[in-house]
Amino acid sequence: MIKHRPHGIEHPYAVSPDQRVPVLPLAGEPVLLGVVAPEADRVVCEWGTLELPLSATSAAAADAAALAGGEGHLSEAQAKSLGADGAWSVQTPPLAEPVKYRFHAHRGGAAESTEWFEVSPAVWTADGVGEVRGGGERVRGVEWLVSSQGVHRGRFRLQLQDGDRLVGFGERYDALDQRGRELDAVVFEQYKAQGVHGRTYLPMPFAHVVGADGNGWGFHVRTSRRTWYSSAGNELTVEVALGDEPVVDLAIYEGDPATVLTGFLDEVGRAEELPGWVFRLWASGNEWNTQQLVTARMDTHRDLAIPVGAVVIEAWSDEQGITIWRDAVYAVTEDGSAHRAEDFSYRPDGAWPDPKAMIDELHARGIKVILWQIPLQKTEFSTGQVAADAAAMVRDGHAVLEADGTAYRNRGWWFPQALMPDLSVQRTRDWWTEKRRYLVEHFDVDGFKTDGGEHAWGHDLVYADGRKGDEGNNLYPVHYARAFGDLLRSAGKAPVTFSRAGFTGSQAHGIFWAGDEDSTWQAFRSSVTAGLTAASCGIVYWGWDLAGFSGPVPDAELYLRAAAASAFMPIMQYHSEFNHHQLPLRDRTPWHVAETTGDDRVVPLFRRFATLRESLVPYLTEQAARTIATDRPLMRPLFFDHENDPEIWNHPYQYLLGDELLINPVLEPGATTWTTYLPAGEWIDVWTGDRVPSGLVTRDVPLEVVPVYCRASRWSELQPVFS
């Protein structure tokens, strides 16, 4: 067997061994051609009138190493997905005109050939073959990437001034100000180290230009296709993938940051106000996979007097069908139709002997319940409900399709080869969520952790709403969160979804967290940046796995600094990764961190932060409502209120929590003092009640203190929170 796919597996950042690189070469560029022919002794490319012998290669090992996010169970799968045995490659002469090519694989006296492929050189031209709509005089240097196959991309330049700052582009982990950086906007599951790699689960083709002269503005490329950005000197170059029409639709918003954000959200939608309970502490651990474990963890919260408002149960179904409690007894619905609550019974010796009673008990204690989801359907089971559901998805037209009409199978490393429901249309959204309705209506589940959503790879995938993959893939996580929000609303509940992936339009759909991260100080800093950039784009309800979820248990200092900061973020949650149930445990519960580190300060200080968080819930609820009404972020970068103060850019991790509180997380180990910049105004140190002048102020930061300052005008109302 010999395989060559010009686009490869369409990993956005890596090359697969059967790929053409580049897929769309420029005139005068050579092309690297790859094939996979595991049993071949010799492979030859028929390239026009030339015959090019291929050499055996080591299947993108460098890409696999670069993309593995570090230690963790997903890193192995990630690296493995890019490898292949029997990889061959050859570099062609520079491409000057369209060329047809094919491959011949030889083994002994036998030969096998591929079909013919064609590649055409492309050139950038300033000829008026397309149109940039909108932008006016801000748009310069318009060019189009053209080949004999059509117009593929457009690019243009936006003028910047000295001192202008670029903030936005969705959730970004590497820097608040993206001036001088190169980035793109494509939904991608980067397992850890997102800031190092410059990738994100939640991109948006939108940014603020915070003007050094006070004349700010912003822009939105109205597309769901991939875009690229590069700023050098006083210009921002924007490159846009095109569809059938050579048109770029660009919106420009003039005004201060809040005005710019309002213009953007008026187009794409804004957050829906969620109930106050979402601001309480969330507790989670992937290995809490039985009723006994979940109950025990919540009992310990109670016994140690550590308030908790929600528990996220990830392994309730053990990642098989994600619809039925593990060990439940039931009859398979062979047509893939939804079960009802009365269709199930639960074994006394099973993992979840009485999940309804467990949820009722948690509710009686004031603890909400969130269940994990992923928008994939496993296919490795030949019998049972999972197999019936997979067959129904394909048979009844609910699957995302390949260009040839077959069902798309996940090309990524997590749930490989799984089917993907086509959530672009209401028909499939209803079919997919109806299987979970009994969880909401009978079990009284309060929300869903809508994990994943980054699994669509392929420019030519086919969606039922008429889009192809190049246009529909980035929108997939938006449809996904919407589907579960609609399910919850239909049952009379708030649309509490908890997602990591998203795109333009995600602002209207629930809560987000920063995704997979190690327990390191660098990840802590990256997560703060992620929260601020997401907020700049209209994400209101946002959090992270405090102190990271992956790798060894964090030391006490990192854990407590992260908990202190998280008490002053929109969502406060701890979580731990799957670790094959090995010992020692890697739970991030405060008592386990205390036991692991031997530091007896952890539990009392964490209790202090969680109790303080309870007192902040009314303030956070009030401020979230104000955010939605005014478009001034809840976790607010300082430039929204102090855009004309150049000093704020020297303090990129500081932020306002609502209108009244300024937060400066302690982000380095071993700190005994910490310096905060207080913009113009009158401020109160919330821990001492002392009035503090604006400017640079340094205070002691023992582990129980994160620098927080309140505007003096609201101190009388907020003082009881900190008493």
Swiss-Prot record:
pH dependency: Optimum pH is 7.9.
Enzyme nomenclature, EC number: 3.2.1.204
Temperature characteristics of this protein: Optimum temperature is under 41 degrees Celsius.
UniProt key word Transit peptide: no
Entry keywords, A to Z: Carbohydrate metabolism, Cytoplasm, Glycosidase, Hydrolase, Polysaccharide degradation
Name the record gives this protein: 1,3-alpha-isomaltosidase
Signal peptide: none
Biological processes per GO annotation: polysaccharide catabolic process
Annotated localization: Cytoplasm
Record flagged with keyword Transcription regulation: no
Active site: 451, 454, 516
Molecular function via GO: carbohydrate binding; hydrolase activity, hydrolyzing O-glycosyl compounds
Organism from which the protein derives: Kribbella flavida (strain DSM 17836 / JCM 10339 / NBRC 14399)
InterPro entries (alphabetical): AIMA-like_N, Gal_mutarotase_sf_dom, Glyco_hydro_31_C, Glyco_hydro_31_N_dom, Glyco_hydro_31_TIM, Glyco_hydro_b, Glycoside_hydrolase_SF, Glycosyl_Hydrolase_31
